[in-house]
C-alpha cells in the first residue's frame, strides 16, 4: 500500500458555538497549556504523514479567535478557512465544496474539539481505507456502561450493549461520494450516518477512549488536567526545643510525630512541643510560600497554649489543598541523644501519613545523635529537619 498515490485532505469542523459547555468563549478556542483546543487539534493533523491539506470550517463570528489560534502555525498544509453554516452538516458541506478545486481522493472529517486524536489512529484509518477500498471508515469504541431508554426521568427499558458502539471522529471517506451525499440532504449530525442513510458501506476500526470530545465543562477540566504539566514545590523546615525537668505530678513523656514517647524530661514549648510536626508544618508552609508556623500560630497568643500540634499539621495540609497541592513525599531527620526513636518509627509514619492523606511509604523518618557534641550532644534538647516535595493535585474542579 502506498498512501502517497492518493491526495488526502482533512476537514476540521470548528464552527460550533459550544452552548453545552457554558463557557464565555467557544470551546474550540479555550486554552489548554497556553494554546487553544483548535491549535492542538490542527497540530495533530499537520504532523501526520498521510495528510496533504487541512481546511478548517469556522464560524463567521469567530474569525478573530481563529486568527489568534493559528498565529504560530506556518505549515502550508493549513489552507485558508471556510465559513461554516447554521449546523454541523451545512458546515461540513461548505467545507467539502471548498475542497473541490483540490479534488482529493479521500477526506478526513474531524471535530475540532477532539484534540487527543493520535497519529496512530489517523494512520489506521487511512491505511484501512486504502487497503480494503471502503467507501468510509470510522473509529468506534465499545459501550461499557449500561444503556437504557428513559422517559420523564424514569427508565423504560435496558438496551443490550452487544452491538452498540460509540462512533468517534476522525472519519475518512471517498471525497466525491461524501460530497454527493451532503449535497442531497439538509441536516445530519454525523457523516457516517449520512453515508449509511445513502446505502454506502462504512466500516469501523477500533477507536481510542482517550480521543474523547470536549462537550461539557467537565470535559474541558479533564482536558486541562491531561495537558497540564504537573508542578512541584520543595520546602525545608527546622525546629528545636529545649528539654526541661518534668513538673511534679505531670506525665513523663514527650510527643514526636504525634506519638507519645516515655522520657525522663519534658519539652519546653508554648504548644504541646511536637518538634517534628512543627518542622513538617514549616516545610509545607515554606513550599507554599506561606511564611512559617509562628506567623499563623504565634507563641504570644494564649489561644495556642498547650495546643495539640496535629491542629497545625491539619492547617498546613488544608492550606496546600487550597492552593492545589498535595504532599508527594516527606523526609524527616530527628536529632537527639535520647530518647531512642527507632521503636516508634512505624507508629510515627502512620500518624503523619494519615494526617497528610498519603501512603506511609512516602513518609521517611530517620534518627541520629549529635555524637555528644553541642547542646544536643549534652542532651539539652531535640531538633528536627524536614524536607517536603509537593505536587499539583490531580482532580476535576
From Swiss-Prot:
Q: Which domain of life is it from?
A: Bacteria
The site (Positions MEP for the nucleophilic attack) lies at 161, 213
Quote the CDD domains the UniProt record gives: CDP-ME_synthetase (cd02516), MECDP_synthase (cd00554)
Q: What is its EC number?
A: 2.7.7.60, 4.6.1.12
Q: Where is this region: 2-C-methyl-D-erythritol 4-phosphate cytidylyltransferase?
A: 1-233
Does the record's keyword annotation contain 4Fe-4S? Answer: no
Cofactor dependency: a divalent metal cation
The residues that hold 4-CDP-2-C-methyl-D-erythritol 2-phosphate are 239-241, 270-271, 292-294, 368-371, 375, 378
Cite the residue spans of the region called 2-C-methyl-D-erythritol 2,4-cyclodiphosphate synthase.
Answer: 233-397
MF terms in GO:
2-C-methyl-D-erythritol 2,4-cyclodiphosphate synthase activity; 2-C-methyl-D-erythritol 4-phosphate cytidylyltransferase activity; metal ion binding
Pathway the protein takes part in: Isoprenoid biosynthesis; isopentenyl diphosphate biosynthesis via DXP pathway; isopentenyl diphosphate from 1-deoxy-D-xylulose 5-phosphate: step 2/6; Isoprenoid biosynthesis; isopentenyl diphosphate biosynthesis via DXP pathway; isopentenyl diphosphate from 1-deoxy-D-xylulose 5-phosphate: step 4/6
Q: Where does a divalent metal cation bind?
A: 239, 241, 278
Q: Which reaction does it catalyse?
A: 2-C-methyl-D-erythritol 4-phosphate + CTP + H(+) = 4-CDP-2-C-methyl-D-erythritol + diphosphate; 4-CDP-2-C-methyl-D-erythritol 2-phosphate = 2-C-methyl-D-erythritol 2,4-cyclic diphosphate + CMP
Which processes are annotated in GO (biological process)? isopentenyl diphosphate biosynthetic process, methylerythritol 4-phosphate pathway; terpenoid biosynthetic process
Name the site position(s) for Transition state stabilizer. 20, 27, 270, 369
List the Pfam families.
IspD, YgbB
Q: Which Gene3D superfamilies match?
A: 2-C-methyl-D-erythritol 2,4-cyclodiphosphate synthase, Spore Coat Polysaccharide Biosynthesis Protein SpsA, Chain A
Going by the UniProt record, its keywords in alphabetical order are: Isoprene biosynthesis, Lyase, Metal-binding, Multifunctional enzyme, Nucleotidyltransferase, Transferase
Similarity annotation:
In the N-terminal section; belongs to the IspD/TarI cytidylyltransferase family. IspD subfamily. In the C-terminal section; belongs to the IspF family.
In terms of PANTHER family, this protein maps to: 2-C-METHYL-D-ERYTHRITOL 2,4-CYCLODIPHOSPHATE SYNTHASE, CHLOROPLASTIC
Please describe what this protein does: Bifunctional enzyme that catalyzes the formation of 4-diphosphocytidyl-2-C-methyl-D-erythritol from CTP and 2-C-methyl-D-erythritol 4-phosphate (MEP) (IspD), and catalyzes the conversion of 4-diphosphocytidyl-2-C-methyl-D-erythritol 2-phosphate (CDP-ME2P) to 2-C-methyl-D-erythritol 2,4-cyclodiphosphate (ME-CPP) with a corresponding release of cytidine 5-monophosphate (CMP) (IspF).
* Protein name per UniProt: Bifunctional enzyme IspD/IspF
Q: Which organism is it from?
A: Wolbachia pipientis wMel
Gene name of this polypeptide: ispDF
Amino acid at each position: 500500500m502506498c498512501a502517497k498515490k492518493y491526495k488526502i485532505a482533512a476537514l476540521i469542523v470548528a464552527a460550533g458555538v459550544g452552548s453545552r459547555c457554558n463557557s464565555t468563549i467557544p470551546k474550540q478556542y479555550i486554552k489548554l497549556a497556553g494554546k487553544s483546543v483548535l491549535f492542538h487539534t490542527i497540530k495533530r493533523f499537520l504532523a501526520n504523514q498521510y495528510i496533504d491539506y487541512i481546511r478548517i470550517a469556522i464560524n463567521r463570528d469567530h474569525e478573530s479567535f481563529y486568527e489568534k489560534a493559528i498565529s504560530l502555525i506556518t505549515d502550508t498544509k493549513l489552507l485558508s478557512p471556510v465559513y461554516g453554516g447554521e449546523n454541523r452538516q451545512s458546515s461540513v458541506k461548505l467545507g467539502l465544496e471548498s475542497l473541490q478545486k483540490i479534488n482529493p481522493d479521500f477526506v478526513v472529517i474531524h471535530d475540532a474539539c477532539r484534540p487527543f486524536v493520535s497519529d496512530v489512529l489517523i494512520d489506521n484509518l487511512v491505511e484501512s481505507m486504502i487497503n480494503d477500498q471502503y467507501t468510509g471508515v470510522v473509529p468506534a469504541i465499545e459501550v461499557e456502561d449500561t444503556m437504557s431508554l428513559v422517559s420523564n426521568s424514569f427508565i423504560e427499558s435496558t438496551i443490550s450493549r452487544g452491538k452498540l458502539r460509540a462512533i468517534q471522529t476522525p472519519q475518512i471517506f471517498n471525497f466525491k461520494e461524501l460530497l454527493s451525499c451532503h449535497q442531497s440532504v439538509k441536516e445530519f449530525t454525523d457523516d457516517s450516518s449520512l453515508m449509511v442513510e445513502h446505502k454506502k458501506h462504512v466500516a469501523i476500526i477500533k477507536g481510542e477512549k482517550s480521543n474523547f470530545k470536549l462537550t461539557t465543562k467537565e470535559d474541558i477540566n479533564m482536558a486541562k488536567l491531561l495537558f497540564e504539566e504537573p508542578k512541584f514545590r520543595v520546602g525545608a523546615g527546622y525546629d528545636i526545643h529545649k528539654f526541661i525537668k518534668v513538673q511534679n505530678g505531670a506525665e513523663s513523656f514527650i510527643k514526636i510525630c504525634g506519638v507519645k514517647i516515655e522520657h525522663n524530661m519534658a519539652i519546653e514549648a508554648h504548644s504541646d512541643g511536637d518538634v517534628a510536626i512543627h518542622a513538617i508544618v514549616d516545610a509545607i508552609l515554606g513550599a507554599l510560600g506561606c511564611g512559617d508556623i509562628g506567623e499563623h500560630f504565634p507563641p504570644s497568643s494564649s489561644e495556642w497554649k498547650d495546643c495539640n500540634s496535629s491542629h497545625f499539621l491539619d492547617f498546613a495540609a488544608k492550606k496546600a489543598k487550597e492552593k492545589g497541592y498535595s504532599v508527594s513525599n516527606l523526609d524527616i531527620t530527628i536529632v537527639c541523644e535520647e530518647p531512642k526513636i527507632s521503636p516508634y518509627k512505624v507508629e510515627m509514619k502512620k500518624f503523619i501519613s494519615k494526617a497528610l492523606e498519603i501512603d506511609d511509604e512516602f513518609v521517611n523518618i530517620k534518627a541520629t545523635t549529635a555524637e555528644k557534641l553541642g547542646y544536643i550532644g549534652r542532651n539539652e534538647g531535640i531538633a528536627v529537619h524536614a524536607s517536603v516535595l509537593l505536587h499539583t493535585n490531580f482532580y476535576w474542579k
